[in-house]
Amino acid sequence: MDGLTAAESRELDQRLQKRQVKEFMSVFGNLVDNCFTACVDDFTSKALSGRESGCISRCVLKSMSTQTRLGERFGELNAAMTAEMQRR
């Protein structure tokens, strides 16, 4: 990183990694909460029913597809903004 000492750069990297872990845990927690709430409604058994299991699989797949698309779109927007700034 420009203008940073090696120690400052390491500290910044550690902070960024910590933030990324927190963000991942937040997204994961929301995924679990959303899919559990949407799919699990029978608490008479420890095991998931076939319907609940299928619902959770579809919910997780849909959420992951959405996250992937959002990441792609943010990348596209970032590339466009970077190109625009370089033209100026």
Curated annotation (Swiss-Prot):
Motif Twin CX3C motif: where in chain: 35-59
Membrane topology according to the record: Peripheral membrane protein
Coiled-coil spans in chain: none
Gene3D superfamilies per record: Mitochondrial import inner membrane translocase subunit tim13 like domains (1.10.287.810)
Pfam families in UniProt: zf-Tim10_DDP (PF02953)
Organism superkingdom: Eukaryota
SUPFAM superfamilies: Tim10-like
Record keyword Methyltransferase present: no
Protein's cellular compartments: Mitochondrion inner membrane
One term under GO cellular component: mitochondrial inner membrane
Keyword Protease annotated: no
InterPro entries: Mito_inner_translocase_sub, Tim10-like, Tim10-like_dom_sf
Keyword annotations from UniProtKB, A to Z: Chaperone, Disulfide bond, Membrane, Metal-binding, Mitochondrion, Mitochondrion inner membrane, Protein transport, Translocation, Transport, Zinc
Disulphide linkage map: 35-59, 39-55
Subunit structure: Heterohexamer; composed of 3 copies of tim9 and 3 copies of tim10, named soluble 70 kDa complex. Associates with the tim22 complex, whose core is composed of tim22 and tim54. Interacts with the transmembrane regions of multi-pass transmembrane proteins in transit.
Family: Belongs to the small Tim family.
Primary role: Mitochondrial intermembrane chaperone that participates in the import and insertion of multi-pass transmembrane proteins into the mitochondrial inner membrane. Also required for the transfer of beta-barrel precursors from the TOM complex to the sorting and assembly machinery (SAM complex) of the outer membrane. Acts as a chaperone-like protein that protects the hydrophobic precursors from aggregation and guide them through the mitochondrial intermembrane space.
Record text about domains: The twin CX3C motif contains 4 conserved Cys residues that form 2 disulfide bonds in the mitochondrial intermembrane space. However, during the transit of tim9 from cytoplasm into mitochondrion, the Cys residues probably coordinate zinc, thereby preventing folding and allowing its transfer across mitochondrial outer membrane.
Record's protein name: Mitochondrial import inner membrane translocase subunit tim9
